């Protein structure tokens, strides 16, 4: 069980209700976030700095910015509700905090899906931190 928790912590974005975000990614891309998006580019995975390297890395940058704007709750722990409808994700529930987190995760999962054609595992997975030194874009 401890191994599963450690793996969950490594998921893309590192925050939010990780298993829900992972499920969103799988449903939208048919790829697992853990193996396809953690350690990708300069922003996918733990932390982030520099300039996003491609559209997928930009999805992670925008996701990080989105979490930074979440107010009055902890994006690392709040479980939210959502459904998959007509190939998209619909966030539900009445809690504004949880809905904000869900919307951040929804946007990232949809962004990953929309950029599968430029996703470059060979080039950007385990991308070197020394290549992420340029000044970051503002959120």
UniProtKB/Swiss-Prot annotation:
Its EC number is 3.1.1.4. Keywords: Calcium, Disulfide bond, Hydrolase, Lipid degradation, Lipid metabolism, Metal-binding, Secreted, Signal, Toxin. GO terms for cellular component: extracellular region. GO terms for molecular function: calcium ion binding; calcium-dependent phospholipase A2 activity; phospholipid binding; toxin activity. SUPFAM superfamilies: Phospholipase A2, PLA2 (SSF48619). It catalyses: a 1,2-diacyl-sn-glycero-3-phosphocholine + H2O = a 1-acyl-sn-glycero-3-phosphocholine + a fatty acid + H(+). Disulfide bonds join 42-132, 44-60, 59-111, 65-139, 66-104, 73-97, 91-102. Residues 1-16 form the signal peptide. GO terms for biological process: arachidonate secretion; lipid catabolic process; negative regulation of T cell proliferation; phospholipid metabolic process. Its cofactor is Ca(2+). Its main location: secreted. It comes from the Eukaryota. Binds 1 Ca(2+) ion. It is found in: Secreted. The active site is at 63, 105. Ca(2+) binds at residues 43, 45, 47, 64. Belongs to the phospholipase A2 family. Group II subfamily. D49 sub-subfamily. PLA2 catalyzes the calcium-dependent hydrolysis of the 2-acyl groups in 3-sn-phosphoglycerides. This is Acidic phospholipase A2 Ts-A4. It comes from Trimeresurus stejnegeri (Chinese green tree viper).
């Amino acid at each position: 069980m401890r191994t599963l928790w450690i793996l969950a912590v490594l998921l893309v974005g590192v925050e939010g209700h990780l298993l829900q975000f992972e499920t969103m990614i799988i449903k939208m891309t048919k790829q697992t976030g853990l193996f396809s998006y953690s350690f990708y580019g300069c922003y996918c995975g733990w932390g982030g700095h520099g300039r996003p390297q491609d559209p997928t890395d930009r999805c992670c940058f925008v996701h990080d910015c989105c979490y930074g704007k979440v107010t009055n709750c902890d994006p690392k722990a709040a479980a939210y509700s959502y459904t998959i409808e007509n190939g998209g994700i619909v966030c539900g529930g009445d809690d504004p905090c949880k809905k904000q987190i869900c919307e951040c995760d929804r946007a990232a999962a949809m962004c990953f899906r929309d950029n599968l054609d430029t996703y470059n595992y060979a080039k950007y997975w385990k991308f070197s931190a020394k290549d992420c030194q340029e000044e970051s874009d503002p959120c």
